[in-house]
A protein has these predicted regions:
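Structured beta-strand/loop patches that form or line metal/cofactor-binding pockets in enzymes
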Residues: 1-47, 51-53, 332-338
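Metal- or metallocofactor-binding catalytic centers and their adjacent structured scaffolds
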Residues: 5, 39-117
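Hydrophobic faces of well-ordered beta-strands that scaffold small-molecule active sites
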Residues: 48, 132-140, 163-165, 196-200, ...
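Shared catalytic-loop signature of beta/alpha-barrel
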Residues: 94, 228-243, 251-351
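Glycine-rich, aromatic-flanked loop segments that form ligand/cofactor-binding clefts
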Residues: 98-101, 105-147, 302
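Metal-dependent enolase-superfamily TIM-barrel catalytic cores that perform enediolate-based chemistry
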Residues: 127, 132-240
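Extended hydrophobic packing segments that form well-structured cores
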Residues: 357-377
Length: 377
C-alpha cells in the first residue's frame, strides 16, 4: 500500500451565540480549519484536521502543507517512523508550533489509514483499551467572577469534574485582584472535589505570576503556563507551591527533555496536533512516565473530527489529571462529521458511537469534500 494523494478541504464553523469565548490572546467566535485527506493506491482513505496558527492564517498554512505532503507521496503509510523523518526534513530546525500542526494533520490521517486497513480502531493500534468513555474538562471563558462562577456551576451540573479557567490580560488590561476573585468564585461554584486548572495562556509576566499565585493556593488549583518561554516558566516554578503545568512550552520531545532536565514544571499539557501527531505524542508521554512527570490531555481549536482522534489517544495513556480536552466542538453551531460517528458527549464524558469501528471511526460529511485543494500527488 502506497500513499498516492493528499488533499485539503477548508471549513468554517461558527460558535453558538452565547457569551463570547474570551482568552488572553483574543476572542474566539469561529473555527477556520481544514480537513486533510490522504488516499492510498489500495483505495483506503484517512482523515486529519489542520488548525492554522495564527488562527486567521489558514490559506498560508495550506500552502505550507504542500512542502510536507510531498515528502510522503509514494511511501507506505505503515512506515510511520520513516514518514516522520521525511516530514521533519521539510521543517525548520527550531520546529515552530505552526509547522508541527501541519505534520499533525497528516499523522492523524496516517493512523486513520492504518486502522481502517487493519480493521482495528486506532486506540488498539496504540495499545490502549476503550473503557466506556473518557472524562473531559470544560474551559470557562474570561469574564466577571459572577459570570465565570455561573458558567462553572452549569458545567459541573452537566457532569464535568475538571474545569479549566481562562485567565490573563484581555485587551491589554489585567487586574490581579480580579483574577483571584475569579478563582474564588469558581471554587465556590464547583465545590471542593472538582479539579480546577487556571490557564492564563501565557498572559502574565513572571512578576505578576509570583505575586498572584500564592493568594490562589487556598483554592487548591493547578496552574497552566502563566508566562511565555521556558526560562520564565522555570522562575515561576521555583517561586510557587501550586502544581505548575507546561503547555505552550511543551511542544515536542526535545523541549520536554529540557523541561525535565531543568525541573521547569511539575506536569505537561499535551495536544496531539501541536506535537506533530500521535507518533511524537506517544514518545512524549513515554518520557513523562519514565521520568515521573505528570501529564494531561488537551486540545487545540478543533472540530469533532480531531477530538475523536484525541479520545483514541486518551484511552492509551492514563493522565495525572483524569480529564481530556476536546470539547470545543460543543461550542459550534455546525458539525463536520457524519451523524452517529466519532465522539459524542454524555454529560461530562466523551464516548465513541462505535468503539469497534476501524481507524478513527469518523468520516467528514460528503458535502464538505466536494472542492479539494490539491496538496501532493
Amino acid at each position: 500500500m502506497k500513499i498516492t494523494m493528499i488533499e485539503a478541504f477548508p471549513f468554517d464553523l461558527r460558535y453558538k451565540p452565547t457569551r463570547d469565548f474570551l482568552v488572553s490572546y483574543g476572542v474566539i467566535d469561529e473555527m477556520r480549519n481544514a480537513i486533510v485527506r490522504v488516499t492510498t493506491d489500495d483505495g483506503v482513505v484517512g482523515y486529519g484536521e489542520l488548525m492554522p496558527l495564527p488562527l486567521d492564517n489558514r490559506d498560508a498554512c495550506i500552502e505550507d502543507l504542500k512542502n510536507i505532503g510531498k515528502a510522503v507521496i509514494g511511501q507506505d503509510p505503515y512506515e510511520i517512523r520513516e514518514l516522520h523523518a521525511r516530514m521533519d526534513e521539510q521543517l525548520s530546525a527550531e520546529l515552530p508550533s505552526q509547522e508541527l500542526l501541519l505534520k499533525g494533520a497528516i499523522d492523524s490521517a496516517l493512523y486513520d489509514i492504518m486502522g481502517r486497513a487493519a480493521g482495528l480502531p486506532v486506540y488498539k493500534l496504540l495499545g490502549g483499551s476503550y473503557n466506556d468513555g473518557v472524562p473531559m474538562h470544560f474551559s470557562i471563558s474570561i469574564g466577571s467572577p459572577e459570570e465565570m462562577g455561573a458558567d462553572t456551576a452549569a458545567r459541573v451540573a452537566e457532569g464535568f469534574r475538571t474545569i479549566e479557567v481562562k485567565l490573563g490580560r484581555f485587551q491589554g488590561e489585567l487586574d490581579l485582584d480580579t483574577e483571584i476573585a475569579r478563582i474564588a468564585a469558581i471554587r465556590e461554584s464547583a465545590g471542593p472535589d472538582v479539579v480546577i486548572v487556571a490557564d492564563p495562556n501565557i498572559g502574565w509576566t513572571v512578576e505578576e505570576a509570583i505575586d498572584v499565585l500564592p493568594a490562589m493556593e487556598e483554592f487548591g488549583i493547578y496552574i497552566e503556563q502563566p508566562v511565555k518561554g521556558l526560562d520564565d516558566l522555570e522562575k515561576v516554578h521555583r517561586a510557587i507551591r501550586s502544581p505548575l503545568i507546561a503547555d505552550e512550552s511543551a511542544a515536542n520531545t526535545r523541549v520536554l527533555a529540557e523541561i525535565i532536565q531543568r525541573d521547569a514544571a511539575d506536569m505537561i499539557n499535551l495536544k496531539i496536533l501541536r506535537t506533530g501527531g500521535l507518533y511524537e505524542a506517544c514518545k512524549m508521554l513515554d518520557m513523562c512516565e519514565a521520568f515521573d512527570i505528570g501529564y494531561r490531555h488537551d486540545n487545540v481549536i478543533q472540530s469533532r473530527l480531531a477530538s475523536t482522534m484525541m479520545i483514541h489517544f486518551s484511552t492509551t495513556y492514563q493522565a495525572s489529571i483524569p480529564d481530556c480536552g476536546g470539547t470545543q466542538f460543543t461550542r459550534t453551531i455546525e458539525d463536520i462529521v457524519n451523524d452517529d460517528e466519532g465522539v459524542y458527549m454524555d454529560g461530562g464524558t466523551a464516548k465513541l458511537y462505535d468503539p469497534d469501528a476501524p481507524g478513527m471511526g469518523a468520516t467528514p460529511k460528503p458535502e464538505l469534500l466536494r472542492d479539494p485543494i490539491p496538496i501532493a500527488g
